[in-house]
Amino acid sequence: MSSSIVIALPKIEDAKKIRTILNRHGLTVASVCSSVSNALASISELDSGVLICGYKLTDAYYKDALDNLPQYFEMLLLASQRIIDEAPNSVSTVQMPMKASALIDTVNDMLYHLA
């Protein structure tokens, strides 16, 4: 079973930029989208992995995705410190604006624990 990465951000251009950063560090992204519904559809076809998600997507908030996220997937929320302070403990976080190194380290750590 291999772990996958799905990126869901309201601006598809931002999601593609993050995909490029991850690719440069040897991480493969399975899907890039701007809505919770598309992210969950992609996740349903994967074995396990990490959903990198923004606070508010085009069709719902991150908590809606979290409520429907299968147990074999974990969420990484990219948000402001105010939002992070309110996030459940089950959600990993990276504060925006983010440093690429913080993103890479967090994703690698999450994937390691899923393996």
Where are these regions (language model features)?
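Conserved hydrophobic helix-helix packing surfaces used for dimerization/oligomerization
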Residues: S4-I5
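Conserved acidic carboxylate
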Residues: A8-L9
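Two-component/phosphorelay signaling modules centered on CheY-like receiver
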Residues: I12-S31
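Conserved phosphotransfer microenvironments
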Residues: A15, V36, G49-Q71, S80-Q81
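A short, well-structured beta->alpha microelement
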Residues: L27-E45, A60
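Short loop/helix-cap segments at secondary-structure boundaries that form the rim of catalytic
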Residues: I43, R82-V91
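C-terminal output helix
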Residues: M98-L111
